[in-house]
Amino acid sequence: MTTATPVKTEYEAIIGLETHCQLNTTSKIFCNCSTEFDSPPNTNVCPICLGYPGVLPVLNEEVLASAVKLGLALNAKIAPYSKFDRKQYFYPDLPKNYQISQFDLPIVEHGSLEIELVDKKSKEVTRKTIGITRLHMEEDAGKLVHAGSDRLAGSTHSLVDFNRTGVPLLEIVSEPDIRSGQEAAEYAQELRRLVRYLGISDGNMQEGSLRCDVNISVRPVGQKEFGTKVEIKNMNSFSAIQKAIEYEIERQIEAVENGDPIYQETRLWDESNQETISMRKKEGSSDYRYFPEPDLPPLEVSEEKLNAWKQELPELPAQKRKRYEEALGLSAYDARVLTDDREVAEYYETAVNTGADAKLVANWVTQDIAAYLNNSKLSIIEIALKPDSLGELVQLIEKGTISGKIAKEILPELLEKGGSPKKIVESKGMTQISDPAEIEKVIEALMEANPSEVEKYRGGKKKLKGFFVGQVMKETGGRADPKLTNQLAEKLLNG
C-alpha cells in the first residue's frame, strides 16, 4: 500500500483488526458437507450444519492443524488445552441460534506479526511489529440474499442460503497497535500472504475468504485513556480498509473538536459514497451469553503433534525476504515484491537455481514479466516462459552472447510460446557481435563516411560519440556489444 495521507498530528488513532479467514478444507468444520464456493443455494447442507435436534458435531482435524500452523507462523503460544463455546445470538442465517466458537480458552494466544511499510516515492521500507491477541476456530454463518437490493434496506424480500453455514473460520484478533489506514491494510495483506504460503486459504477478499472488521478510536496525542471504540464492517478490498479508516479517523476527530458524542456502534463502509454509516449499537461479549459447548470434548495438543505440525511449515514470507536480502543481495523493495506471491517466489528461485545472477533475474521478474502478467491478467504459472528458460536468457546476457536489447526483443515470443532462448537467438541470427575486429571495421567505415562528424568530435564535441555508437547498432541490427562498441568508438575517434 502507498503511504497514507497524514491525519491531524495532535490526534492519534488506536486501531485493532478482527480478521476472519475462511479455510480451504474440502468439508465443513463439524460435518462432512462440501465447502465448495458458488454451489446452488442450500445444496451443501445436512442435519448437523442445519442444527437439527439430536445430531452431534465432530471436529474436522484439518481445521485444528490449520489453526496451529497459523499460530506458529504468528510466533504465538499454542494452548495445550482449549475448548469450544456457544456464542448465542438470533439471526436468520444462523439455524441453531448459536455459533460454535471459542471464548476464554482459544487455541492460540500472544503472537506477533511484522509488517513492512513502503514509501511511495523513495521505495524505502520500514518495519513495525503488530501484536496478536488471539486466534480461535469457529463456524461460519449462512448468507442472506436480499432481493431488489444488495442490502436489507430497499429489498422486497430476503432469502437464506445455508451452504456457508459450518464452513471453518479462523478469527485472528490483533492488539490495538495499528495507527493508520496504511498500517491496517498492510497488516491484512501480510496475513493473507501467510495463509496463502501455508496453503490453508486463498485469502480472496472479494469472495469473502478473508473478511476484516476494524475497531477504531481516536485520542489526543499523549492521552493514556482510550476514546470510544467504533467497529467498521463491509470492506472487501485492502484499499477499502485504508479508505474506511482514513474517513473514520477524520469523522471522529471532527466530532471530538465539535464536542459531539461518539457512540460505541457498528458502522458500515459505503463504497459508493466513500463514507461510514451507522448500522447498529455494538454488542459486548456479555450479550452473547457464552457457555462451554457440551457436544464437543476439550482439545488437547500434544508435544508430538505440535512438533509434527512445526515440521510441515514452509519458509514464510518474512523469512524469504530476509534470505533474499542477506544471501542474494536484493533490495528490501525487490525482496518484498518477489515474495508477495508464493508462486512468483518459487518461479524466481527456480530461475536463479539455473546459475543465473540473482539480481538480474529479479529485475526481469519484477519489471518486464510483472508488466506482462498485469496486462494479460495471467498468473506466473500460466505463462509459456518457464523459469528454466528465464535463467537461460539471463545467462546468455551475462556471457555476452546477446545484449539486453536483444533479450527484450525475443521476450514477447518467449512469454507467448515458450521455448529455448538460445535456440531462438541462433535460428534468427541474433547473437551478439563481441569480436573487436568486426566492430572496429564498422566504426572505421562510419568514420570514413562521416569525416565532418569526426572533425567536430576531435574539436571538442564529445557527445558525437553517441552518434557513432548509434550508427554501429543500426548497421549491426542491434547485435554489437554496446559496452565494447563504446570503448572502441572512443579509442578510434581519439585517433
From Swiss-Prot:
Q: What is its EC number?
A: 6.3.5.-
- The signal sequence is none
Q: Which reaction does it catalyse?
A: L-glutamyl-tRNA(Gln) + L-glutamine + ATP + H2O = L-glutaminyl-tRNA(Gln) + L-glutamate + ADP + phosphate + H(+); L-aspartyl-tRNA(Asn) + L-glutamine + ATP + H2O = L-asparaginyl-tRNA(Asn) + L-glutamate + ADP + phosphate + 2 H(+)
The enzyme's main class, written as a single word, is: ligase
User: Can you supply a Gene Ontology BP term from the record?
Assistant: translation
- SMART domains in the record, alphabetically? GatB_Yqey
| Swiss-Prot/TrEMBL keywords | ATP-binding, Ligase, Nucleotide-binding, Protein biosynthesis
Q: Which residues cross the membrane?
A: none
InterPro entries in alphabetical order: Asn/Gln-tRNA_amidoTrfase_suB/E, Asn/Gln-tRNA_Trfase_suB/E_cat, Asn/Gln_amidotransferase, Asn/Gln_tRNA_amidoTrase-B-like, GatB, GatB_C_1, GatB_Yqey_C_2, Gln-tRNA_amidoTrfase_suB_CS
Q: Which GO terms describe its molecular function?
A: asparaginyl-tRNA synthase (glutamine-hydrolyzing) activity; ATP binding; glutaminyl-tRNA synthase (glutamine-hydrolyzing) activity
Q: Which Pfam families match?
A: GatB_N, GatB_Yqey
What family does the database annotate? Belongs to the GatB/GatE family. GatB subfamily.
Fetch the HAMAP family from UniProt: GatB
| Complex formation | Heterotrimer of A, B and C subunits.
Checking PANTHER family in the record gives: GLUTAMYL-TRNA GLN AMIDOTRANSFERASE SUBUNIT B MITOCHONDRIAL AND PROKARYOTIC PET112-RELATED, GLUTAMYL-TRNA(GLN) AMIDOTRANSFERASE SUBUNIT B, MITOCHONDRIAL
The record describes the protein's role as: Allows the formation of correctly charged Asn-tRNA(Asn) or Gln-tRNA(Gln) through the transamidation of misacylated Asp-tRNA(Asn) or Glu-tRNA(Gln) in organisms which lack either or both of asparaginyl-tRNA or glutaminyl-tRNA synthetases. The reaction takes place in the presence of glutamine and ATP through an activated phospho-Asp-tRNA(Asn) or phospho-Glu-tRNA(Gln).
Q: What is this protein called?
A: Aspartyl/glutamyl-tRNA(Asn/Gln) amidotransferase subunit B
Instruction: Supply the source organism for this entry.
Output: Crocosphaera subtropica (strain ATCC 51142 / BH68) (Cyanothece sp. (strain ATCC 51142))
